Amino acid sequence: MSWSILEFLRKNPEELKNNLKRRAIDVSLVDKAVELDKKWRQVLQEVERLRHQHNVLSSQIPKLSGEERKKKIEESKNLLKILEDKEKELEKIEVERDRLLSSLPNLVADDVPNGPDDSYNIPIKFWGKFKVYEGDVEEFLRQTKDANVNYEIIKWKPKGHAEMLEDVLHLGNTLKAAEIAGSRFYYLFNDIVWLDFALLLFAIDYITQQGYTLVLPPYMLRGEVIQSVIDLDTFKDAIYKIENEDLYLIATAEHSVAAMFFKEEIEKDKLPLKFAGISPAFRKEAGAANKDLKGIFRVHQFHKVEQFIFSTPEDSWKYHAELITNAESIFQQLELPYRIVNIASGDLGACAAKKFDLEVWMPAQAKFREMVSCSNCTDWQAFRMKIRYVDRKNNKRGYVHTLNSTAIASTRTITAILENYQREDGVVEVPKVLRKYLEIFPKAPKDYIYPLKNKII
């Protein structure tokens, strides 16, 4: 089984063009790729013909003697030189073709909504009881139109997570962090740090109970590897590079876990392989200059637990459903109300064929905010990383499918807890499911997080 994009290129280039149109990408790239592939196949035929000629000639030489033998040896040398030149030409064309094809985004799944940006994303599910300030009811109903949602109206306006963190609880300081490190960094203290750790422990406890192998991966990857996992040309402003080193800081454990089988083959009967990666995540957020400047929703570093699956092509959609189900279970246990959104074609990102986002309702902001991103990357990453499965019983090889989903991104989930679990007096209730991870530590909060009288710094 060959790479899906290459198959489309050969069998149905017009369909490949339609796919690019759904992402608003220049379709002339397909025409260039078709020409390169046609040229590659022509040169391949020449190479195979020359190889056959050389093999025939080589088999004749041992049977000859004298001048005729010398003549054939010379002829063989000349033919070998021509063959080597043709093989180099073939390799050059193949590299050029594959580089062009690798620059293309993944094929979009049929049931992905068409549209150039996130305004075309379609909510497909709502869960939980939504806490809505009386002045925001109209806006809430606009965002949940045509959905049968359960909500309660509250008469007091919840405070935003940034205000709660710094001015009410006095358990965070982004101003001092900005002074010594720049914007989008933070200091967190005491109960919020315990909350961060409890979220991570809860997520890895739950996900590993679903049969996932826990992994602590490298926090940096070489350029060749990160380029294979993501579209680095597009995301170069989002990824940190180590100065004077061929190393990049990962933006999620997905990157390192995906590369675990870089340039390797996996026995088909070992699939699926399921992992839960835990790591810090480092992001420049260069494209979000004026978004979420306050608080800890959009930051340069945070802790994250990531689900990742290597699958056979025929099973990948089943596992995509499993990943989002796991994520939903985590947020249901946290009792954070959310919606699931089917992401539009123009908002997908190059890697994904289809993506669901889980967005939690933030009552202070009166909007849904992304907490989880769940993608089926089909064979897009696997082709670039040269990760194949081997079916020895049927003598077949093919590219694996890779899938990923957030389990928990700690700081974002903390913002959701601060907005959804706050009381009017500023006290924040600790979600019940997290309490068993805190009770073993004498200094950790148990049931509630109380405001400090004075700031720590």
UniProtKB/Swiss-Prot annotation:
It is found in: Cytoplasm. Keywords: Aminoacyl-tRNA synthetase, ATP-binding, Cytoplasm, Ligase, Nucleotide-binding, Protein biosynthesis. Pathway: Aminoacyl-tRNA biosynthesis; selenocysteinyl-tRNA(Sec) biosynthesis; L-seryl-tRNA(Sec) from L-serine and tRNA(Sec): step 1/1. GO terms for molecular function: ATP binding; serine-tRNA ligase activity. InterPro entries: aa-tRNA-synt_IIb, aa-tRNA-synth_II, aa-tRNA-synth_II/BPL/LPL, Ser-tRNA-ligase_type_1, Ser-tRNA-synth_1_N, SerRS_1_N_sf, SerRS_core, tRNA-bd_arm. Its EC number is 6.1.1.11. One of its GO terms (cellular component) is cytoplasm. GO terms for biological process: selenocysteine biosynthetic process; seryl-tRNA aminoacylation. L-serine binds at residues 252-254, 306, 406. It catalyses: tRNA(Ser) + L-serine + ATP = L-seryl-tRNA(Ser) + AMP + diphosphate + H(+); tRNA(Sec) + L-serine + ATP = L-seryl-tRNA(Sec) + AMP + diphosphate + H(+). It is an enzyme of class 6 (ligase). ATP binds at residues 283-285, 299, 370-373. Catalyzes the attachment of serine to tRNA(Ser). Is also able to aminoacylate tRNA(Sec) with serine, to form the misacylated tRNA L-seryl-tRNA(Sec), which will be further converted into selenocysteinyl-tRNA(Sec). Belongs to the class-II aminoacyl-tRNA synthetase family. Type-1 seryl-tRNA synthetase subfamily. Homodimer. The tRNA molecule binds across the dimer. Consists of two distinct domains, a catalytic core and a N-terminal extension that is involved in tRNA binding. HAMAP family: Ser_tRNA_synth_type1. PANTHER family: SERYL-TRNA SYNTHETASE. This is Serine--tRNA ligase.
